[in-house]
A protein has these predicted regions:
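A composition-driven surface/loop motif
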Residues: 1-163, 167-172, 179
Length: 179
């Protein structure tokens, strides 16, 4: 993991993942963004992040967690595989934007798993990323604002979750789909 020069955007932390494999066996996030204005991830190659234990603090649980905006940048050309047996895969107390790369999330690991796949307190936007979600709980969740799926580029969004029945039943209220 390389940390970019913070002088380009002093409020942002940029991480470049190039063939990274990380496992958290303590419940702590593999990537933790605290006290930053933004956390920007750029992925190349195949990157795999996994957790195998529940977080001690449910408020900060997530394989990738930030109390700031989290963005997977449009410059991502690689794959980000996230497997979580106990915690939300990507969680932000602010916005989440998935703008590039191939993102595959599995939170439906075993019978005891009950973790959301992607959860933002504010806006959740997918625009330019190929996203595959298998979730034992909510697949895409925003607590306060919209979930936006912007399309038109032939980018697939594949969702599998017992909660998607409710998700799609309220599609006009929860999700803005732009073509």
């Amino acid at each position: 993991v390389n940390v970019a020069d913070p002088t380009a955007d002093p409020d942002a932390v940029s991480l470049y993942l190039q063939g990274v494999t990380m496992t958290s066996s303590t419940g702590a996030p593999c990537i933790l963004g605290q006290s930053a204005g933004k956390l920007k991830l750029t992925c190349s190659g195949i990157n795999t992040l996994t957790d195998t234990a529940a977080a001690a603090n449910a408020d900060t649980s997530g394989v990738i967690y930030g109390d700031c905006d989290i963005t997977v940048t449009k410059n991502s050309t690689g794959t980000l595989n996230i497997t979580s047996s106990m915690n939300t895969a990507i969680r932000s107390k602010d916005d989440i934007k998935l703008n590039g790369g191939n993102i595959s999330i599995n939170t439906d690991v075993d019978a005891t798993s009950d973790a959301d796949a992607i959860r933002a307190n504010n806006t959740l936007e997918i625009d330019g990323a190929s996203v595959t979600v298998t979730s034992s709980a909510d697949g895409l969740k925003s607590s306060k604002e919209d979930v936006s799926i912007l399309s038109g580029k032939g980018i697939p969004l594949i969702l599998s979750s017992p909660h998607f029945i409710n998700f799609f039943a309220y599609l006009d209220q929860l999700v803005k789909i732009h073509y």
